[in-house]
Each structure stands twice: as C-alpha cells, then as structure tokens.
C-alpha cells in the first residue's frame, strides 16, 4: 500500500518570510474558499508568529481575522495550525505563564486546531508547559525541533530531544528547518529514528528554500516516514520561502507516494488573488531580495527571511566602517566584500555564543554581534567591545539553556559587567500578569471580548494593542503606506485620504485637528514631508476609551 503524504499550505509564513504584513480579514475571507477548492491541502497555517501583532500594527483586530480565516477550513475538515514561540508565545520576549495558558484557550475557541510550539534554543522547559496547556484547551500539541547544522546539532541530539518531548505528551513532532540548512540525509535519519520508536506519531517537515536543500530534504523525509510537508504556492513560493506544492506533489507522485491532485483552476485563482493582495498594499513591504535563493546562506546558517533586514543593516554600517578603515589607512570594502566578511564573522561568533538555533530572535542576536564586531574591528577595537543589550538574556540563561557552550571570553565579559548567570526555569523569571490587565480593562471600560480574546491581545501585545484601540496604529500605518505609494509613483486611493474629523467647537481642538488634516493632505504632494503635530489637545479627542 502506498504511503500517503499530506500537504500543509503555510499561508501565514508565505507572507511573513517575504515581507512584514499579512492579508487583511476581508482578503483572508476571499482566499480561504479558493484554497479549499484546490483540493490538495489537509492543513493550512492560519495564524501565529508575528501575524497577530502586525494586524494590530495596521490598525485591525487580529481576533476577527483569525476567526474569519479558520472558519471555512473548520467547516470542511481541513486542520488549521498556528506558530507558537513557546516561552515567547506570539512576541519576541518572554511571556508570563498565565498569558501563555490563556492563549491556547483563546486560539482553540477561535478555530485553531494545532499549535506548533518551538523554542529557538530547543530547551524542553520552554515547550513542555505549552504541550500541557494546549492539550487542556483542546488543541493538538505539535512539539517542534528547530533544525540547524552544527557539531552540536547531531542526529542523536534531535532523536533524544524528540524522545523527551513525546514522553512529556507531544502528540506530533515538527522538524522546523527555518533556514533550510538541514542536510537531506541527516533529516531522513532523524525521521527514521523517531518513527522506529513511535510509528503513530505524526511528523511534519517545514523547510525553507533559501540555500536550496529543501526539495531534496522533502524527498528524504518522505522516504523516512514523514506524514506532512509544508509547502507554498505562487507568487510567494521559492526564494527565501518554501517549495511550491506543484513541484513537491509531482516529485512525490512519481516516487510512488499517494498524494492529492491539485485543482489547477483553483490554484491559478488563488495565485491571482495573492498577487492582487500584493498589489493592493502588501507588496510595499516585501523585499525583492526575498524572492531569490542564495547558496551564501549554506555556510552562515542564517534564515533567508532576514536577508532584507540584514542587507539594510549592512548598508547602514557600510559607510561608517569604510570611513573608519580609511582613517586608519586600511583598504576599504565593497558591499559584497563586507557581506562575505559578515557571513564569515557569523560563522565564527555563533559557536562562541552557545550555538543557538538561528531563528527569531536568536538569529538577530548572532547577526548583530557579528556586525558590531566588524564595526569594532574597523575602529581598532577588540571583538565584542560593542554588544546588543537585548542578547544578554540569551547569554545569561534567562531565555533558556543554550545548546552549546559559551566561549571563555564571553563568560569573562559577563563577569566584568557584574552580570549573573541563571540556570533555573526561565518561566520563573516572569510572574503572572493577567490580574493587572483585567483591572486596567475594567477601569478603562474595555470589553474583554469573546472567550477573553481582547484580554489576551492586550496582555500579549500591550503597546500595539493600546495604539490599535486609540486609532494611532491605523493612522501611522496609513501615513506609511501613503509615503511608500508616493515614492513608487502610485496614485493614492480616496479611501486612504484623511477625513475631516468631527470634533467639538473647542478652539484648540479644532486648530489641532485642522492642522493634522491639512498636513496629511499635503503629504500627498510629491515633495511633501508629513509634519508631526504635537499638542496635549490631541490626547483629549483621541482617548483610549474606544
């Protein structure tokens, strides 16, 4: 009997590996039935990661978006799944236990079936509590192993990690190859070893295409017993994203696996809709570099999705580094030469920093350390003279246990700064906070929402939620979009033009509102720069009680 391989469309990750934002609620409602009509997907990634935070950033309610997107899939039996950062849940920094626990209740009520729980350090202590809470809420707990390639991250390392996660209740295992640098045969060996002991455990493989291994990896893990493969579709497949379902389906079908057929008419319709969403507004935040693969990532191991921000950082430092080199009488570097030096420095400092998996946020920490070392070198300073303050939590153990060991100079540097290392459970450092947010919502008269979903968003993304409630997020997003459209020479739609606000006849309020209105109008002129209006009166007619 042929082995069946299922496909999951990682619709959320397609967008967030390409750019910043995800489609709006109304766009998700349009694409969902077409994805269903394609007939080849048993699962769809609907939310999680940064998707809900960016909903708030463009001034819309993420809870409504999740419910809207999951509902059609729930009705036809396609399983929905979300990305969950373990200790960090849906943000970049640690989250209190009570907020994490509430997340699973809220997401299950919103129609999410499976949570993919990962920790960038692969520390089981950050994953195991989520397994318990997810199952209690009625979700399927998919424990995740972040894949990378290093002397620390061996087949034995991953098999032992899977055993621990399964022993603590994991119902599924995901191999999250976020940089796509897992070697195909190694991945096959990991899957085969897990299946040899746990035949009924579902294994899902997630591999980005950046350095070019992922198609071969998918064939290897399928042969070894994997059950589900994450795929993308045009116009956002390949590049730094994921292989296209058409290619993977054809490859596996020829190899003798049982795979569902693709309704190509629906595929083309979904393709056209996604392109329409890009043209509407999402494309203004998509970095074109993310549409190209590069083998330069094989050595440094950085995830391709961060190439856009990496190149922006590199460009920002390029002139300063060359100015320092010229001042010291040394040869200046081209941008390409500096890029190669950066990748080499990443390879050098990565093991010195404990070999964390290069995934959010730890990939940023390692990249920042390497870039600052290049700057320090251009100044004639020692390596690690300048450190990103945010990375000390990782170094000191406050984010979890590092897979490797810290270099002696890093330990000595921490001692010089009178910093203390922490070996306890990271969650213990972050006390419960829900009572604080409940009290404030009551004081402000804010509704906690269906199934406490508004309470959850407030506690998870406090700053962004306040700006969403005040209307500031929508205003800032529209200003940013108008500026990007203006730079691209695109006409500004009437819907983005600021409306004359309706306010009281208070003279100060009227003056501030009119000044803001006129400034926004003027921003549409080719050479205009939007002025910042500062007044205490603004707070009076734009309160948080919305």
Placement of each model-derived feature along the sequence:
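N-terminal amphipathic alpha-helix/helix-capping segment at the start of soluble metabolic enzymes
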Residues: 1-18, 66-71
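Conserved, mostly hydrophobic/aromatic
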Residues: 14, 117, 173, 225, ...
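Active-site beta->alpha loop and helix N-cap motifs at the rims of alpha/beta catalytic domains
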Residues: 33, 42-43, 47-166, 179-184
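Catalytic cores of alpha/beta
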Residues: 156-165, 211-227
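C-terminal helical cap(s) of enzyme catalytic domains, especially alpha/beta-barrels
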Residues: 237-262
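Terminal or standalone catalytic/regulatory effector modules within metabolic enzymes
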Residues: 36-54, 289-527, 538
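Surface-exposed amphipathic alpha-helices with a cationic face
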Residues: 66-74, 128-138, 188-199, 249, ...
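Glycine-rich phosphate-binding active-site loops on the catalytic face of alpha/beta enzymes
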Residues: 117, 177, 224-243
């Amino acid at each position: 009997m042929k082995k069946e391989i299922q496909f999951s469309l990682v619709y959320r990750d397609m967008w967030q590996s390409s750019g910043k934002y995800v489609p709006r609620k109304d766009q998700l409602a349009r694409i969902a039935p077409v994805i269903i009509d394609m007939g080849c997907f048993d699962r769809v990634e609907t939310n999680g990661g940064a998707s809900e935070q960016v909903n708030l950033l463009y001034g819309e309610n993420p809870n409504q978006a999740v419910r809207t997107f999951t509902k059609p899939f729930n009705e036809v039996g396609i399983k929905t799944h979300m990305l969950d950062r373990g200790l960090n849940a849906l943000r970049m920094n640690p989250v209190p236990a009570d907020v994490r626990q509430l997340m699973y209740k809220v997401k299950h009520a919103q129609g999410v079936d499976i949570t993919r729980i990962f920790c960038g350090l692969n520390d089981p202590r950050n994953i195991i509590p989520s397994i318990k809470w997810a199952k209690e809420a009625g979700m399927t707990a998919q424990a995740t192993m972040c894949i990378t390639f290093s002397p620390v991250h061996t087949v034995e390392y991953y098999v032992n990690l899977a055993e621990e996660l399964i022993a603590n209740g994991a119902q599924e295992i995901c191999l999250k190859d976020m940089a796509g640098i897992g070697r195909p045969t190694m991945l096959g060996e990991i899957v085969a070893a897990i299946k040899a002991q746990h035949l009924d455990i579902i294994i899902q493989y997630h591999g980005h295409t950046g350095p070019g291994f992922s198609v071969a990896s998918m064939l290897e893990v399928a042969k070894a017993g994997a059950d589900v493969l994450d795929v993308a579709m045009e116009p956002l497949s390949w590049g730094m994203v994921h292989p296209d379902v058409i290619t993977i389906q054809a490859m596996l079908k020829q190899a003798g696996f049982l795979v569902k057929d693709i309704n190509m008419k629906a595929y083309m319709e979904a393709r056209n809709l996604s392109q329409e969403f890009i043209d509407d507004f999402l494309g203004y935040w998509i970095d074109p570099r993310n549409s190209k693969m590069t083998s330069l990532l094989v050595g440094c191991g950085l995830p391709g999705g961060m190439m856009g921000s990496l190149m922006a950082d590199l460009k920002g430092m390029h002139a300063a580094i060359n100015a320092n080199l010229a001042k010291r009488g040394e040869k200046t570097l081209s941008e390409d030469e500096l890029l190669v030096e950066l990748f080499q420095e990443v390879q050098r400092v990565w093991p010195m920093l404990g070999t964390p998996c290069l995934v959010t946020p730890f990939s940023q920490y390692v990249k920042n350390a390497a870039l600052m070392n290049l700057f320090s070198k251009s100044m004639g300073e020692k390596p690690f003279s300048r450190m990103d303050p945010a990375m000390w939590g990782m170094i000191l153990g406050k984010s979890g246990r590092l897979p490797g060991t810290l270099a002696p100079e890093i330990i000595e540097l921490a001692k010089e700064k009178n910093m203390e290392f922490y070996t306890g459970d990271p969650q213990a450092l972050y006390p419960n906070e829900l009572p604080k947010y409940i009290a404030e919502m009551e004081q402000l008269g804010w509704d906690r929402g269906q199934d406490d979903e508004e309470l959850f968003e407030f506690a998870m993304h406090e700053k962004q939620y306040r700006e969403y409630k005040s209307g500031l997020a929508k205003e800032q997003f529209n200003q940013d979009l108008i500026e990007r459209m203006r730079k691209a020479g695109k006409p500004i739609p009437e819907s983005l033009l600021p409306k004359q606000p309706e306010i009281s006849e208070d003279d100060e309020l009227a003056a501030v509102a009119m000044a803001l209105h006129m400034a926004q109008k003027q921003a549409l002129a080719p050479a205009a720069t939007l002025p910042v209006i500062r007044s205490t009166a603004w707070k009076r007619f734009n309160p948080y009680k919305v």
